[in-house]
């Protein structure tokens, strides 16, 4: 069943928070994107970068797990501050809260393992564990 309430760790100012991550394939013009809202609902979109959307509902993450992940994402952004290293493929993590006008995005080349991208790569792997294998 889909959750009908936001996770208990979510404040009034965080209700609209969205966490996104995925891989953009610039040469193909495609993206594989995952979006998680404050209810812990996970949405998947695979397709054209130009037509990007939140995608279809995939699953609901346990709300305690959501709280841990949201905290980890914010901590990682506070630690990393800025990361924008693109290649023909680019991995990314976004933290977006429209209500408080916060938009954070880290982008890195998954074909390179740089010191600067280490924390984001680890966080990306942690987020990808939520995605069921096809």
Predicted regions and their residues:
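Well-ordered beta-strand positions in beta-sheet-rich domains
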Residues: 31-33, 56-58, 105
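Short, solvent-exposed loop/hinge segments that bridge or flank secondary-structure elements
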Residues: 25-37
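A short-motif feature that recognizes glycine-rich, charge-decorated loops
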Residues: 43-79
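Residues that act as N-cap/strand-start positions at coil-to-secondary-structure junctions
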Residues: 28-30, 53, 87
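Structural signal for glycine-centered tight turns and loop->strand junctions in beta-sheet-rich domains
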Residues: 38-42
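Short, well-ordered, aromatic-rich surface patches in folded extracellular/luminal domains
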Residues: 1-26, 76-134
């Amino acid at each position: 069943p889909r959750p009908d309430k936001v996770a208990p760790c979510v404040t009034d100012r965080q209700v609209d928070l969205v966490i996104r991550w995925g891989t953009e394939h610039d040469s193909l013009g495609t993206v594989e994107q995952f979006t998680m809202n404050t209810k812990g609902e996970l949405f998947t979109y695979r397709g054209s970068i130009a037509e990007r959307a939140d995608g279809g509902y995939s699953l609901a993450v346990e709300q305690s797990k959501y709280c841990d992940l949201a905290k980890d994402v914010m901590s990682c952004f506070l630690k990393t501050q800025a990361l924008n290293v693109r290649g023909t493929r680019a991995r990314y993590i976004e933290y977006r809260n429209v209500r408080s006008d916060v938009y954070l995005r880290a982008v890195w080349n998954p074909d390179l393992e740089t010191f600067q991208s280490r924390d984001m790569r680890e966080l990306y792997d942690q987020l990808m564990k939520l995605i069921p294998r096809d």
